A protein has these predicted regions:
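A composition-driven signal for long, intrinsically disordered, charge-rich low-complexity tracts
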Residues: 1, 16, 30, 84-87
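Intrinsic-disorder/low-complexity, polar/charged segments enriched in Ser/Thr/Lys/Arg/Asp/Glu/Gln
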Residues: 1-5, 60
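Compact, glycine-rich, soluble single-domain proteins
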Residues: 7-57
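C-terminal structural segments of small proteins and small subunits
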Residues: 52-87
Length: 87
């Protein structure tokens, strides 16, 4: 298991478009990808779960990856969040 805490820089937070971009990008990885926020963990491969988390701009989230390609999954997930999630 690997993890990293990152700050959400997207001005609108994790709304439909960024949640979709994130989910589509991490789904091909075999590893589980979870987002830790406000004491809860959310499935990073589920658009609905990401939207339900109500993650706002400036929030610190923990990206947690566990599986055979966890390092690559974490690198991709961190890159997406740090780049603004396509917005």
């Amino acid at each position: 298991m690997v993890s990293k805490v990152v700050k959400v820089t997207n001005e609108q937070g994790m709304h439909m478009r960024p949640a979709t971009v994130f989910s589509v990008a991490v789904t091909p990885f075999e590893s589980d990808v979870k987002i830790g926020y406000n004491g809860m963990q959310y499935d990073g491969k589920s658009v609905m779960m990401l939207m339900a988390a109500c993650i706002k701009c400036g929030a610190e989230i923990e990206i947690i990856c566990n599986g055979s390609d966890e390092e690559a999954a974490l690198a991709k997930a961190v890159e997406l969040v740090e780049s603004g999630l396509g917005d």
